[in-house]
């Protein structure tokens, strides 16, 4: 089975970019919520 490097990179980016975007949004939401509590 031949692995296509470009396909592998594209798949990795396709998974990593939305995941990191959601993580950043989540962290910002939690941080702002903690600031509002104080």
UniProtKB/Swiss-Prot annotation:
Topological category with respect to the lipid bilayer: Single-pass membrane protein
Pfam family, one: PsbM
Keywords on record: Cyanelle, Membrane, Photosynthesis, Photosystem II, Plastid, Reaction center, Thylakoid, Transmembrane, Transmembrane helix
Main location: plastid
GO cellular component annotations of the record: cyanelle thylakoid membrane; photosystem II
TM regions (residue ranges): 5-25
Location of this chain's protein in the cell: Plastid, Cyanelle thylakoid membrane
Database matches in InterPro entries: PSII_PsbM, PSII_PsbM_sf
An individual GO BP term: photosynthesis, light reaction
Assembly mode: PSII is composed of 1 copy each of membrane proteins PsbA, PsbB, PsbC, PsbD, PsbE, PsbF, PsbH, PsbI, PsbJ, PsbK, PsbL, PsbM, PsbT, PsbX, PsbY, PsbZ, Psb30/Ycf12, at least 3 peripheral proteins of the oxygen-evolving complex and a large number of cofactors. It forms dimeric complexes.
Role noted for this protein: One of the components of the core complex of photosystem II (PSII). PSII is a light-driven water:plastoquinone oxidoreductase that uses light energy to abstract electrons from H(2)O, generating O(2) and a proton gradient subsequently used for ATP formation. It consists of a core antenna complex that captures photons, and an electron transfer chain that converts photonic excitation into a charge separation. This subunit is found at the monomer-monomer interface.
HAMAP family hit by this protein: PSII_PsbM
Similarity comment text for this entry: Belongs to the PsbM family.
Protein's UniProt name: Photosystem II reaction center protein M
């Amino acid at each position: 089975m031949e692995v296509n490097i470009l396909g592998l990179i594209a798949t990795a980016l396709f998974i990593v970019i939305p995941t990191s975007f959601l993580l950043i949004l989540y962290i910002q939401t939690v941080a702002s919520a903690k600031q509002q509590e104080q």
